[in-house]
Amino acid sequence: ESGYTQGIVGFGVGVIGDGSFKLGKNNHAGNQMIPLHNDGDKDANGHVDAYDHWGRGGGIVKARISNTEVRYGTQVLDLPVLASNTGRMVPEYFTGTLLTSHEIKNLEIVAGKFTKNQMSDQIKTDADVNGNGLDRAIVWGAKYKFDDNLNASYYGLDSKNALERHYVNVNFKQPLANDSSLTYDLSAYHTKFDEAANTYSQTTDNLSDRKNDIWALSTAYNTGAH
């Protein structure tokens, strides 16, 4: 990935990609790691054929003015409400625009719109796979550092024909004697699914009111230099 050109507005480009080779026959392909020919449909003999080798990737263009950056293209996301699955051999990709701003001291603001995603076992983007997958996802959020011991954040997601999700987090570090401290972290998610969404994460069978709430609280004790 390049840096930025000089000037009031700086421009840059970047590329991202991966290549894979399958060792052996692996007749049990279909585990969301190895892509399948014909989108996983069986052939005339009832077999599903996996790729022997494959590559994926894309590019980005980016611009920066002052302390604000805008990126468009293929990206690996790590937002609380929209994150790429990196637990497979290769990561999930999203295609779209992401703005990140640090114009105000100690405040980070993000906003973005994504129109395609590519799972780890997909050769083509979801727009080409039977019309299923991501239609349009809009994300927004902010994180503010009040001081060295306290920060808070909020992020939101509106994924068309899928779900709305909201996330809040508060993190506080309590200094103690002898270079030790206690850190408290509180997180919460609220998700509401559209009637047509495919999900098992629901607390009711009422399709017009499918939602869930998740809360998490953790405490960590730290001592010594860290």
Regions found by a protein language model. Name each.
Residues 2-126, 142-151:
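Outer membrane beta-barrel
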Residues 20-23, 107-130, 179-226:
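Outer-membrane beta-barrel translocator/channel fold
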Residues 2-3, 59-66, 94-104, 129-148, ...:
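Feature captures outer-membrane beta-barrel proteins of Gram-negative bacteria and organelles
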Residues 138-142, 154-159:
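A conserved mid-domain beta-alpha-beta active-site/ligand-binding segment of alpha/beta enzyme cores
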